[in-house]
Amino acid sequence: MRTTSLGKSAASSRRRTIAYWITTVLLALECVVGGMMGALHYHLYVRNMEHLGYPLYFMTILGVWYLLAGVALLAPRFPRLKEWAYAGLVFNYTGAVASHVAVGDGVMTLVGPITFTALAVASWALRPSTRRLDHDI
């Protein structure tokens, strides 16, 4: 039985869609859980923010933004809003890396934010055409 190039293309498209949804759901879950923990000032997050030198009210702001980003990533339509959510998450995760480096934390503290940066970039790169902007910005 021969597989046509059309069959390979459809299989590739299906794998890409599955990879998109896996990365996006994982990212959105992190946003919702992390957002709630930040907005509600979960004690481990409080300790981390104090260690990094940030004011605690910043947790509420970031927590709400995280929740909104998680909803935006999963919601149908609104491709521009999704672009903003992805950008905000990348800014946040790379900012977390910079903050941990600035206070002299070890390499292991960078694994989480680097992993989530990669997840955000992967989700963004894999998104289907229905979730992309129709034109260049």
Residue ranges, per PLM feature:
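Membrane-interface extramembranous regions
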Residues: R2-I137
